[in-house]
Amino acid sequence: MSAVEAPSASQAIWPELTEDHPLSQLNSRLPTILSEAGHSQIWGVTLTYSTPPTFSSLIILQKFLRSVDNNVDEAATALGKTLKWRKDWGLDARADKKEKENFGPDFEGLGYVTKIKKNDGGDEIVTWNVYGAVKDLKSTFGDLDRFLRWRVNLMEEAIAHLHLATTSTPIPDFNAGIDPHRMAQVHLYEGVSFLRMDPHVKAASKATIELMAANYPELLSRKFFVGVPLIMSWMFQAVRMFVSAETAKKFVVISYKENLANELGELEGVPKEYGGKGLSLGELQNQLRGEDAVTSS
């Protein structure tokens, strides 16, 4: 099979694929997968079957393959389920119309998306979950469907900043290199030791872990747990039960929030309260949104 050109000005080329390559095999199943799912959109990419495959479709297929160690059958099943889930949740319909769901004051200040420059010089998107900003446990976590929609909305915004539909950088094969199209997550637990016994929080945490593992493969580079009290150790045991050993290796636990910046990246991209020299999370998020608005205009 010939090399694949990206639909970009740089005319990037995906490494040549043989007919028996896992990507070629998964691509050949796309017609069936798309037909059965009744949906073809994911993370800003419209999956299409062609020979050779489109560059953006390969980005998506490669993520699903890497998540299951190149098992084509498992990747095809997982992709089909995710596409059906996205259709049921109406995620891409809202994205097409550029509609944003309003979750109300119960979720204000709980989640942010920013960009940092890593210690190795590359840019990285970061999602922030500020659990200390929860005003009322039942109001925020009691309606599980609403909480999950909020969490998915935060994830979808972060993924949009990865620009998977227009990237010109391919993803290496499984065990052949690092996927450059991933993000970091920061979970801030300062002041939330009281969450341990709340059943709404436990249910929301468990459901979120399962949903993310099933529908957002290979999007996590690093996951920071900051200011975690010992009483909440149950959460980390729960997380490790629902993710792969490879994913668990990405977890970093930081006791003191001021130490986060040194682990995360360039100080200017991290708020001062977390050891950086940057603006507040809200200001950094608005800055990123402004940059993307200029780029896409």
Swiss-Prot record:
How this chain sits in the membrane, per its record, is: Peripheral membrane protein
GO process terms (BP): Golgi to plasma membrane protein transport; regulation of exocytosis
- Tell me which residues make up the CRAL-TRIO domain: 106-282
Does the keyword Protein biosynthesis belong to this entry? Answer: no
- What are the required cofactors? heme b
Give the organism the record lists: Cryptococcus neoformans var. neoformans serotype D (strain JEC21 / ATCC MYA-565) (Filobasidiella neoformans)
Single GO term (MF): metal ion binding
Family per similarity comment: Belongs to the SFH5 family.
| Entries under InterPro entries matching the protein | CRAL-TRIO_dom (IPR001251), CRAL-TRIO_dom_sf (IPR036865), CRAL/TRIO_N_dom_sf (IPR036273), Sfh5 (IPR042938)
Q: Which gene encodes it?
A: SFH5
Q: Where does heme bind?
A: Y131, R151, H187, Y189, K223
Q: Name one GO cellular component term.
A: cytosol
User: What does the record give as the function of this protein?
Assistant: Non-classical phosphatidylinositol (PtdIns) transfer protein (PITP), which exhibits PtdIns-binding/transfer activity in the absence of detectable PtdCho-binding/transfer activity. Regulates PtdIns(4,5)P2 homeostasis at the plasma membrane. Heme-binding protein that may play a role in organic oxidant-induced stress responses.
Keywords, alphabetical: Cytoplasm, Endoplasmic reticulum, Heme, Iron, Lipid transport, Membrane, Metal-binding, Microsome, Transport
Name where it's found: Cytoplasm; Endoplasmic reticulum membrane; Microsome membrane
Enzymatic reactions: a 1,2-diacyl-sn-glycero-3-phospho-(1D-myo-inositol)(in) = a 1,2-diacyl-sn-glycero-3-phospho-(1D-myo-inositol)(out)
- What's the name of the protein? Phosphatidylinositol transfer protein SFH5
Q: Which domain of life is it from?
A: Eukaryota
